[in-house]
Amino acid sequence: MEKSTMSVILFVLHLLVLHLQYSEVHSLANTSAHDFSYLKFVYNATDTSLEGSYDYIVIGGGTSGCPLAATLSEKYKVLLLERGTIATEYPNTLTADGFAYNLQQQDDGKTPVERFVSEDGIDNVRARILGGTTIINAGVYARANISFYSQTGIEWDLDLVNKTYEWVEDAIVVKPNNQSWQSVIGEGFLEAGILPDNGFSLDHEAGTRLTGSTFDNNGTRHAADELLNKGDPNNLLVAVQASVEKILFSSNTSNLSAIGVIYTDSDGNSHQAFVRGNGEVIVSAGTIGTPQLLLLSGVGPESYLSSLNITVVQPNPYVGQFLYNNPRNFINNFPPNPIEASVVTVLGIRSDYYQVSLSSLPFSTPPFSLFPTTSYPLPNSTFAHIVSQVPGPLSHGSVTLNSSSDVRIAPNIKFNYYSNSTDLANCVSGMKKLGDLLRTKALEPYKARDVLGIDGFNYLGVPLPENQTDDASFETFCLDNVASYWHYHGGSLVGKVLDDSFRVMGIKALRVVDASTFPYEPNSHPQGFYLMLGRYVGLQILQERSIRLEAIHNIQESM
């Protein structure tokens, strides 16, 4: 048997073993207050004492950046730079009830939610706070699809992956109560044929299940910032309201290396920080922020950067390309009687679509980006928001600069939703399944009128097409009613911008660790994977340095 074939077989067997380990859910976090113990080593970027030399500088205190910085600080001096502020200044970020409020709050340039409209004309948001997206999202937690790892171009230590998930889950993940509306929607998914019933599980598997949540059963949010508590307070410094303007590079172009960063504080003053020998700059600024910073620093398409008068440090045609966002299509139903508000805890998973629902109280101000545009009609009573997500997707766009010098000016974003016909076909399948869902006995009590089919429901916005065989009507529905799922990824892909250790190709001491690294979602709700990724890469870096130091020691001993 050929060596390559044997390697594939061994890898698949390893995946199966890991899958069995996944199935045994270990103890998760307990209900508790959000743990802000780490604030003792958080500083405002105006503090000039932060300027200096570090072993590692991590740019972006978000989903991957927080666990990465905490892990590296176990052995080395680390500076974590975050453009936003801390959650204590915005207490609504810390509760499940505050999820919609955070999207409603006007963007003043400092609030946790930064608004933007993509060039597709669709409303979107991104995080601007320590903890990143984990502070503003819907709290859904799951592990990656077990097949995802073999598609990434990375050689994973799957035992370490499993232990790293547990490290995250022990701190910030709970088993949620099966809230009344979530229980109803779960019964509906099963009755509509999204089988089997997988009970409670963190695994991404076909079927219906109750999954983990970063909201505990008191409604308190837990998030990536709490993982900073696992860092060494003697080694870890966190600077908030620090906008990194540019990565600094060595003057030796034949041995190009990242040596530090320039960042600006909230007063507009500029600061510098540097990395020591064998240290690294690691960019974890997210799918939008990371390619933007690379481009501003001179890493990207040569002719494009030159046209903006940006000095080209390392040409790479793929920086900012292959940008993805999963389309979200939905229906909104008004039940005849009020339903309690709930966040997403039940998932319906198929290979060609993922389905969830949340229930909401009425509001007079629309949560920005929950609906495709601000002109969408407003609910006057409690309603159910029932969603179908397209996996992948295959359609992709790009990040381009809106300013060649100011990182605080948001870049231009285009996702090209449904430009790939497979994505559109998957949307049609998903929306037809929502039609099946509406026809179930589980949802019968939520009709406003006792008539057959789906006409008995009161809809907010566009109703679902009645004729399940009319693909053209469903395609039109998908195209005309697409919204953002906020699951941005790509822009700095492994194999195109990064090597298989997440190093930027052609540059020493520079890595990227965040959602910009892969061209597809690891699962239906990716925050679990990217929390794991930060810790995982941190451990890999510590292991690399340990091996290097041991080799140097052995050489010295032999002399």
Swiss-Prot record:
<feature type="active site" description="Proton donor">
    <location>
        <position position="487"/>
    </location>
</feature>
<dbReference type="GO" id="GO:0046593">
    <property type="term" value="F:mandelonitrile lyase activity"/>
</dbReference>
<dbReference type="GO" id="GO:0016614">
    <property type="term" value="F:oxidoreductase activity, acting on CH-OH group of donors"/>
</dbReference>
<dbReference type="Pfam" id="PF00732">
    <property type="entry name" value="GMC_oxred_N"/>
</dbReference>
<feature type="glycosylation site" description="N-linked (GlcNAc...) asparagine">
    <location>
        <position position="44"/>
    </location>
</feature>
<dbReference type="Pfam" id="PF05199">
    <property type="entry name" value="GMC_oxred_C"/>
</dbReference>
<feature type="glycosylation site" description="N-linked (GlcNAc...) asparagine">
    <location>
        <position position="255"/>
    </location>
</feature>
<keyword id="KW-0285">Flavoprotein</keyword>
<feature type="binding site">
    <location>
        <begin position="137"/>
        <end position="140"/>
    </location>
    <ligand>
        <name>FAD</name>
    </ligand>
</feature>
<feature type="glycosylation site" description="N-linked (GlcNAc...) asparagine">
    <location>
        <position position="178"/>
    </location>
</feature>
<feature type="binding site">
    <location>
        <position position="133"/>
    </location>
    <ligand>
        <name>FAD</name>
    </ligand>
</feature>
<feature type="glycosylation site" description="N-linked (GlcNAc...) asparagine">
    <location>
        <position position="30"/>
    </location>
</feature>
<feature type="active site" description="Proton acceptor">
    <location>
        <position position="525"/>
    </location>
</feature>
<feature type="glycosylation site" description="N-linked (GlcNAc...) asparagine">
    <location>
        <position position="309"/>
    </location>
</feature>
<feature type="binding site">
    <location>
        <position position="485"/>
    </location>
    <ligand>
        <name>substrate</name>
    </ligand>
</feature>
<feature type="disulfide bond">
    <location>
        <begin position="427"/>
        <end position="478"/>
    </location>
</feature>
<keyword id="KW-0456">Lyase</keyword>
<comment type="function">
    <text>Involved in cyanogenesis, the release of HCN from injured tissues. Catalyzes the stereospecific addition of HCN to a variety of aldehydes in vitro. It is a major seed constituent, and could have the additional role of a storage form for reduced nitrogen.</text>
</comment>
<feature type="binding site">
    <location>
        <position position="244"/>
    </location>
    <ligand>
        <name>FAD</name>
    </ligand>
</feature>
<dbReference type="GO" id="GO:0050660">
    <property type="term" value="F:flavin adenine dinucleotide binding"/>
</dbReference>
<feature type="glycosylation site" description="N-linked (GlcNAc...) asparagine">
    <location>
        <position position="162"/>
    </location>
</feature>
<feature type="glycosylation site" description="N-linked (GlcNAc...) asparagine">
    <location>
        <position position="467"/>
    </location>
</feature>
<dbReference type="InterPro" id="IPR051871">
    <property type="entry name" value="GMC_Oxidoreductase-Related"/>
</dbReference>
<keyword id="KW-0732">Signal</keyword>
<feature type="glycosylation site" description="N-linked (GlcNAc...) asparagine">
    <location>
        <position position="218"/>
    </location>
</feature>
<feature type="glycosylation site" description="N-linked (GlcNAc...) asparagine">
    <location>
        <position position="420"/>
    </location>
</feature>
<feature type="binding site">
    <location>
        <begin position="526"/>
        <end position="527"/>
    </location>
    <ligand>
        <name>FAD</name>
    </ligand>
</feature>
<protein>
    <recommendedName>
        <fullName>(R)-mandelonitrile lyase 1</fullName>
        <ecNumber>4.1.2.10</ecNumber>
    </recommendedName>
</protein>
<keyword id="KW-0325">Glycoprotein</keyword>
<feature type="glycosylation site" description="N-linked (GlcNAc...) asparagine">
    <location>
        <position position="252"/>
    </location>
</feature>
<keyword id="KW-1015">Disulfide bond</keyword>
<dbReference type="InterPro" id="IPR007867">
    <property type="entry name" value="GMC_OxRtase_C"/>
</dbReference>
<dbReference type="InterPro" id="IPR001613">
    <property type="entry name" value="Flavin_amine_oxidase"/>
</dbReference>
<dbReference type="InterPro" id="IPR000172">
    <property type="entry name" value="GMC_OxRdtase_N"/>
</dbReference>
<comment type="similarity">
    <text>Belongs to the GMC oxidoreductase family.</text>
</comment>
<keyword id="KW-0274">FAD</keyword>
<feature type="glycosylation site" description="N-linked (GlcNAc...) asparagine">
    <location>
        <position position="145"/>
    </location>
</feature>
<feature type="signal peptide">
    <location>
        <begin position="1"/>
        <end position="27"/>
    </location>
</feature>
<comment type="subunit">
    <text>Monomer.</text>
</comment>
<dbReference type="InterPro" id="IPR036188">
    <property type="entry name" value="FAD/NAD-bd_sf"/>
</dbReference>
<dbReference type="InterPro" id="IPR012132">
    <property type="entry name" value="GMC_OxRdtase"/>
</dbReference>
<feature type="binding site">
    <location>
        <begin position="63"/>
        <end position="64"/>
    </location>
    <ligand>
        <name>FAD</name>
    </ligand>
</feature>
